[in-house]
Regions:
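N-terminal secretory signal peptides that target proteins for export/translocation
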Residues: 1-5
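Boundary at the C-terminal end of the N-terminal hydrophobic targeting segment
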Residues: 23-30
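Bacterial N-terminal signal peptides
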Residues: 8-20
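PEST-like low-complexity, intrinsically disordered acidic/proline/serine-rich tracts
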Residues: 30-152
Length: 152
């Protein structure tokens, strides 16, 4: 009987720990993206997905000097809520806008049919720069965002 009581007391705590590990893995930058593979893409915005849990910007990399795969890319940004708090809304990136995106390529490096990356910054032709929101646990910090805690 005592072992059943102990199990009843320990099981909920264990379930919470396991749930936290799964949630952390989902939101881990290092699970999907490679901090040793920085990218720079130059292209025109084709589509913006303003959805949870992450926004996505679709563009074609057309930079002739780029060492990255030319063609379609999906670039992950922060959550819509994170971006809204930074003053970015669904109308900040209009279809057809020319942008430069810096970020990090996916670990799988698969580009069929579309390459994937985690975006860090978007730069507009007039020089304005937008931070694309939190890159998640394990993402490199370059100090360009004042709200980021220092890397430990």
């Amino acid at each position: 009987m005592r072992s059943w009581i102990r199990l009843a007391l320990v099981a909920p705590g264990l379930a919470l720990l396991l749930t936290g590990a799964v949630a952390s893995a989902h939101h881990s930058f290092s699970a999907e993206f490679d901090s040793n593979q920085p990218i720079q893409l130059h292209g025109t915005v084709k589509r913006v997905e303003w959805i949870n849990p992450h926004t996505w910007i679709h563009l074609n990399n057309t930079d002739p000097d780029s060492t990255e795969e030319h063609g379609p890319w999906m670039v992950e940004g922060g959550t819509p809520n994170t971006l809204l708090r930074r003053g970015i809304n669904r109308n900040s990136l209009e279809i057809g806008t020319e942008i430069i995106v810096t970020g990090y390529q996916s670990k799988d490096r698969l580009c069929d049919p579309t390459c994937r990356a985690n975006g860090r910054d978007i730069t507009f032709p007039d020089g304005r720069k937008l931070f694309m929101g939190s890159s998640g646990t394990g993402a490199p910090r370059d100090g360009s965002d004042d709200s980021e805690p220092p890397q430990q």
